[in-house]
């Protein structure tokens, strides 16, 4: 067993807590996990004790999961206080302390506001004594611990903190406090430099310059610098990226990844390239559900939430301005089929991986927390996650669209074979998000009912598809997928809907508060699941395709052509193979 100590407040509470745990019916781990019992506001002066949970698991499991403990529950202030007490200023933290710190920073928004955390950290930083136990010589140590926590917080949240007014003001305030304290406590010089490095500032002074007479001048000089960390991003409205749907017919659209600030001309350029038409021959028009039409001028902003709720963007040929759907399906479908059939399946899967990775790599771990707990204003905090989920849905629709728009049986059979190979390559490249989407697309009812098409698929392809399908089998809590994914080494992309389902299962199966105390055991389990993202991104993905090959595939993959109406897909399916 590991040698980690367990601290327990008030031994009489142990019996009460054990009962509480059984009543909660939390999923108890079968491996050896010491538990930190309830941290409460009372009994602050009680002695520390220890307790561990015995295990019957084998040594291999024990060696992997020992030396870890979980704070079961407590008030936010007490959890933070314990965390600061256990922090070490050494380069490497104890594993259990590092886990607790990460759990806290990942999930604090569940039980306290950012403003509450900022105020609590300022109180701890400014405290001259802590419960009468620390001597004055320990004050700088306390300050350094707070600064270490803040550094980890900034590192984890990155640009998110730059968009929150409370955190921006807090960082300015604590930076000012460090500048004031560094003369009295020179040991803070290291933390000050690290803090400035994180904030993107460059200090122009030495400790010797921080005499009381020079403090104000130095402080003014510091804040006259351009604070790069505040300018790292523009406003959310300007930089936020979304998938803009530009409809070609009533039920089919081209998906364009664009910034909210994109002009009509910028979007039209992408659409024209996708349709292989001259840009000057096309125009964009907004058609409201009321029937009202508005043609976009080149410099008009084409994306707005009000338009999304009340109408759609269509592209049309100027010489056919009087028709609503100028691009007939038959006109484009054959060219589209020939185009994808001429593409290399491995390279196409590689470009899918490249596109998905750019979305996946942009997701903040906290987005899963916001998405699950549905806190107020979560929409703007889950932009990247929503994009990847939307992408998964679009890839599924893309597969069905391409197959059902191919009117020739022989070419349709080739397309199905093509998608089976692409799915296999996505699995090999460890892009499980697109892998699932393609398999689900092939299993869409409008595609799977094409008996004449599937009858002509060679046996080896049917066998391969059956093997791929087995990985998506949901039985035993998706055991086949979980076992395969666990063996894959980073970089890899998980099937995000299932990861969200795991987090949601933990959330809905356990209360967030127990007797007005934060159920931190639940939050630890959620944080552990969310850290899957970090593990998947331990290594970065890089494509080795030539720029010329990549450009054509990138243009195709970035702007998939899909039909988003299940009714329209079924109509196409019955048109290809009428019901007997």
Swiss-Prot record:
Q: Where does it primarily localize?
A: nucleus
> What does the entry say induces or represses the expression of this protein?
Down-regulated in nerve growth factor-treated PC12 cells.
- Give the matching InterPro entries: Ras-like_GEF (IPR008937), Ras-like_Gua-exchang_fac_N (IPR000651), Ras_G-nucl-exch_fac_CS (IPR019804), Ras_GEF_dom_sf (IPR023578), RASGEF_cat_dom (IPR001895), RASGEF_cat_dom_sf (IPR036964), Ubiquitin-like_domsf (IPR029071)
UniProt-annotated location(s): Nucleus
What's in the GO CC field? nucleus; plasma membrane
Please cite one Gene Ontology biological process associated with this protein.
Ras protein signal transduction
The record's tissue-specificity note reads: In the embryo, expressed in young neurons of the developing telencephalon, diencephalon and hindbrain. Not expressed in progenitor cells in the ventricular zone.
Q: Which domain of life is it from?
A: Eukaryota
Q: Which GO terms describe its molecular function?
A: GTP-dependent protein binding; guanyl-nucleotide exchange factor activity
Cross-referenced SMART domains: RasGEF, RasGEFN
What are the residue boundaries of the N-terminal Ras-GEF domain, all occurrences included? 67-200
Q: Residue limits of the Ras-GEF domain? A: 344-579
Q: What keywords is this UniProt entry annotated with?
A: Guanine-nucleotide releasing factor, Nucleus
Matching entries from PANTHER family are given as: GUANINE NUCLEOTIDE EXCHANGE FACTOR (PTHR23113), RAP GUANINE NUCLEOTIDE EXCHANGE FACTOR 5 (PTHR23113:SF26)
What function is annotated for this protein?
Answer: Guanine nucleotide exchange factor (GEF) for RAP1A, RAP2A and MRAS/M-Ras-GTP. Its association with MRAS inhibits Rap1 activation.
UniProt name for this protein: Rap guanine nucleotide exchange factor 5
What is the species of this protein? Rattus norvegicus (Rat)
Q: Quote the gene name from the UniProt entry.
A: Rapgef5
């Amino acid at each position: 067993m590991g040698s980690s100590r367990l601290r327990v407040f008030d031994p009489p509470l142990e019996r009460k807590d054990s009962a509480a745990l059984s009543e909660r019916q939390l999923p108890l781990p079968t491996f050896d996990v010491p538990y930190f019992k309830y941290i409460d506001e009372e009994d602050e002066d009680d002695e520390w004790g220890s307790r561990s949970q015995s295990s019957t698991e084998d040594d291999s499991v024990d060696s992997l999961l020992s030396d870890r403990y979980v704070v079961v529950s407590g008030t936010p202030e007490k959890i933070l206080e314990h965390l600061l007490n256990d922090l070490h200023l050494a380069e490497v933290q104890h594993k259990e302390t590092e886990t607790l710190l990460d759990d806290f920073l990942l999930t604090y928004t569940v039980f306290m506001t950012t403003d509450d955390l900022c105020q609590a950290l300022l109180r701890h930083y400014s405290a001259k004594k802590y419960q009468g136990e620390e001597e004055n010589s320990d004050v700088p140590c306390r300050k350094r611990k707070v600064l270490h926590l803040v550094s980890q917080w900034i590192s984890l949240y990155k640009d998110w903190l730059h968009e929150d007014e409370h955190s921006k003001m807090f960082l300015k305030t604590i930076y000012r406090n460090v500048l004031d304290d560094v003369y009295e406590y020179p040991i803070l010089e290291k933390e000050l430099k690290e803090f400035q490095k994180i904030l993107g500032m460059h200090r122009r002074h030495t400790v010797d310059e921080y005499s009381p007479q020079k403090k104000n001048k130095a402080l003014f000089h510091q804040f006259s610098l351009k604070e790069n960390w505040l300018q790292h991003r523009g406003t959310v409205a300007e930089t936020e990226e979304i998938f803009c749907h530009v409809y070609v017919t009533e039920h089919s659209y081209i998906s364009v990844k664009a910034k909210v600030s994109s002009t009509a001309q910028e979007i039209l350029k992408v659409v024209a390239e996708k349709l292989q038409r001259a840009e000057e021959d096309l125009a964009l028009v907004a058609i409201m559900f009321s029937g009202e039409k508005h043609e976009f001028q080149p410099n008009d902003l084409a994306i707005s939430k009000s338009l999304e709720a009340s109408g759609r963007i269509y592209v049309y040929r100027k010489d056919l301005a009087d028709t609503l759907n100028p691009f007939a399906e038959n006109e484009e479908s054959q060219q589209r089929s020939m185009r994808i059939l001429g593409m290399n399946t491995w390279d196409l899967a590689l470009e899918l991986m490249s596109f998905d990775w750019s979305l996946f790599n942009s997701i903040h771990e906290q987005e899963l927390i916001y998405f699950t707990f549905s806190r107020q204003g979560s929409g703007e905090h889950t932009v990247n996650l929503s994009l990847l989920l939307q992408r998964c849905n679009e890839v599924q629709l893309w597969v069905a669209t391409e197959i059902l728009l191919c009117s020739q049986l022989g070419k349709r059979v080739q397309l199905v074979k093509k998608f089976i190979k692409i799915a296999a390559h996505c699995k090999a490249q460890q892009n499980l998000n697109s892998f699932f989407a393609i398999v689900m697309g092939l299993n869409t009812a409008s595609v799977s009912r094409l008996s004449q098409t599937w009858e002509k698929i060679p046996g080896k392809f049917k066998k391969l598809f059956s093997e791929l399908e087995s990985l998506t089998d949901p039985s035993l809590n998706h055991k086949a997928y979980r076992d395969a994914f666990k063996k894959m080494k980073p970089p890899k992309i998980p099937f995000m809907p299932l990861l969200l389902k795991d987090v949601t299962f933990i959330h809905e199966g356990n209360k967030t508060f127990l007797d007005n105390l934060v159920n931190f055991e639940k939050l630890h389990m959620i944080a552990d699941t969310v850290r899957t993202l970090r593990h998947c991104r331990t290594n970065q993905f890089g494509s080795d395709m030539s720029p010329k090959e990549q450009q054509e595939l990138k243009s195709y993959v970035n702007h998939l052509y899909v039909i988003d109406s299940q009714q329209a897909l079924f109509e196409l399916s019955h048109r290809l193979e009428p019901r007997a």
